[in-house]
Amino acid sequence: MTLEIFEYLEKYDYEQVVFCQDKESGLKAIIAIHDTTLGPALGGTRMWTYDSEEAAIEDALRLAKGMTYKNAAAGLNLGGAKTVIIGDPRKDKSEAMFRALGRYIQGLNGRYITAEDVGTTVDDMDIIHEETDFVTGISPSFGSSGNPSPVTAYGVYRGMKAAAKEAFGTDNLEGKVIAVQGVGNVAYHLCKHLHAEGAKLIVTDINKEAVQRAVEEFGASAVEPNEIYGVECDIYAPCALGATVNDETIPQLKAKVIAGSANNQLKEDRHGDIIHEMGIVYAPDYVINAGGVINVADELYGYNRERALKRVESIYDTIAKVIEISKRDGIATYVAADRLAEERIASLKNSRSTYLRNGHDIISRR
């Protein structure tokens, strides 16, 4: 598609797009700020080999809007934004590049706070931190929360229990058969919680070592990647690639609940409508996997793990609220999640509007 930038920004109510260029380091980046009604915009920095500049802009805009909804639904006083860097993260990175980006972020004076994302690391965030305080997910020695995977997993576990309560009348997962697609960092910690509660696990992953670890530690059964959709199970937990709920997989599903850590689980919105009509309880991805962003957001107030985990625990209540809206309004849960986020933003729109205050009033609480 041909991107008419201002027409697009107006249509979806974006506030700002910043183009960042540094000739010496080769930095080419886009910072997209979607909405700051709730507070400064928080969203990660992604580095990717985009096919075109237009594709990079579109990705930044799409991801920024997604962060607005994720942060709002999570109850955070933060808006949504995203940075994308055009380049190959395996060979194009340099200290100069990330320091240049840090200066651009500093120039926004706290309207935008970044974190790591696909293609970037904690080390990259540490370099950005040399130029600005408006970055989270840095090394623990700087007061960071460290690896977010265990906290994200705990949030998914809590959200899964809320979805199970709706589907089975109880949130007790003991004896429930749960098919976990992908056994990476987040899913491994999710499996720990599920195994501890007495759930029976079926796992798959293209990484055979990860599968073997789950088999040995949790007594899981292993299947091939293309077999996971059709297994007899109570809950399907997509924790790897996105778009796994689609025309090909839906007819195979035997689960009554879909709840996992993967992003963009529905290939298209209509797939959310289809599973809703089938009576499958779907825990919307950006609500159930918000533990990571809740965790890093806590760094802005001086990281307290107990406080962060308590907030992540409330993902149970958020999923329950989404299900309540779904039933009340007769809509699919993915629509209900959007409605929950939009209602929260709208309730504060008149009183707060665009965030233009000096960001140090938040970041200084570290």
UniProtKB/Swiss-Prot annotation:
It catalyses: L-leucine + NAD(+) + H2O = 4-methyl-2-oxopentanoate + NH4(+) + NADH + H(+). It is an enzyme of class 1 (oxidoreductase). PROSITE patterns: GLFV_DEHYDROGENASE. Keywords: Branched-chain amino acid catabolism, NAD, Oxidoreductase. GO terms for molecular function: L-leucine dehydrogenase activity. Catalyzes the reversible deamination of L-leucine to 4-methyl-2-oxopentanoate. Belongs to the Glu/Leu/Phe/Val dehydrogenases family. This is Leucine dehydrogenase.
